[in-house]
Amino acid sequence: MTFKFSPDAKVIVEPGSTLTLTDGTLLTSNYMGDPCNVAYTWQGVEVWGSQSNQSQNIMPLAVGKLIMNNSIIEYAICGVRAQKFYNPAVNLHRGGIIVATTGATFKNCIMDVEFLPYVNVYKDKT
């Protein structure tokens, strides 16, 4: 199955959600051209953590999950961003996500995968 996206489009995996791409699923640009030209790319996949998540006690349902098995992400500015992204700033309290891949291919992306720093706002007082 192929999903084509316009330049401003992105896939968002919210906390508690799972996106599973299997057996040849293709996420790609609707405009095939020069992969280094932003006009021909789409935004990619964002996998979000939870702002209220405590990194010492991560609950399996509190974070977004991306599972890729023999699938392709191509022609994206960032294939997978493991954070919630606000252009031009990032939200460092939305990390702590899960990305699992087997046979994943990132083709003609400006950046394949980006893991940003995670700021733990939980302070254990015990």
Could you describe each region identified by the protein language model?
Residues 1-126:
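Extracellular beta-helix/beta-solenoid repeat scaffolds
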